[in-house]
Amino acid sequence: NCPGCFMGAIPDAIKIYEKYKDEGVRVLGLATAFEDFDKNNLDNLKMLVETGEVVGETKSALSQYGQLQEGSKLSFKIPFPIGMDNLTKSAGEITQEKILEFIYPQIPEFDSQPEEYRNQIIQRVKDHMKSKEYSAETFENFSLQGTPSAILVDRKGILRDVSFGQTGHIDGMIQQLLNED
């Protein structure tokens, strides 16, 4: 349920897959959920993989741009494996430590901010954590900012890039990594 994924990132990933599949590059798709849990779920992912059918905002956006067939189906097949992020029911106490662990990567200079600002941010994060129904393991472990996102791992299993939004730079990075070997 990510219009930007289906209009840009997935077609870009398909191009990368087609271009580099014979050079040992592997492309994997990962569906995640940080909202709209009624639509971002395993059943709808299976339906997408098996039939090409999309739902929710993706269906609305692609339909608006005339990019669907038979009303709700993609005009292309996704040729690489797709999995679902591990979603766990949010539970546990929201501690000051958890709140700060969330804040510091986003606002490194947090401690030097005025007290009123810090208190506002802490309250917003606390409210956000209280409202979270599920946690998406990969999404959170890689501190992804949203979708679409790309994670690039080299042949040795070393994380080389995590990016949000446009993925145009990935092709050049893959070329560079292939030349390293």
Task: Give names to the regions the model predicted.
Residues 1-2, 9, 34, 146:
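Short pre-active-site segment immediately N-terminal to redox-active cysteine/selenocysteine motifs
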Residues 1-4, 161:
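The substrate-binding groove and active-site-proximal loops of carbohydrate-active enzymes
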Residues 7-103, 108-110, 134-135:
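Structural microenvironment flanking redox-active thiols in thiol-disulfide oxidoreductases
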Residues 102-181:
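Thiol-/selenol-based redox modules, centered on thioredoxin-like
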